[in-house]
Amino acid sequence: MKSNKIIFLSILICSFDQLTKLIAITTTPARYTPILPGLIRLNLVKNKGAAFSILSSFPFLLSIISLTVALVLILWIYSRSSFNYYNALGIGFLLGGTLGNGLDRWRLGYVVDFIQLIPVNFPIFNFADISINIALIFLLLDILSKKRI
């Protein structure tokens, strides 16, 4: 996959993340809004930390880390002529998720989290978080597809 396609994928993911956050902010009048009753609800949270709210006392540091990761990924994307399928998808999803949460950090000083799984005690998250986890799956598939048995 070519560099421009990876960047385009990242922009789509980041845009979708920002759109879902905007929709959640503007359409959630109460603290909790059921999406799928008993399974998923909207619960707006201003998360100043990273995953599981770690480093919440250092939002500026997290902003710098987001910016650095995004810049390194962009430089890496443009330093290569092409990527294999899983690697390209992994990098695209990672950059898109990093930019989505990074934009929140840079603009707002926190990340907008809003998806809550009701049956399990799991941190509230957003589409950028989902994208980063999907990226890890694609990157793992890339590694496993190169292994010879």
Regions found by a protein language model. Name each.
Residues 1-149:
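Alpha-helical transmembrane bundles and membrane-interface segments of multipass inner-membrane proteins
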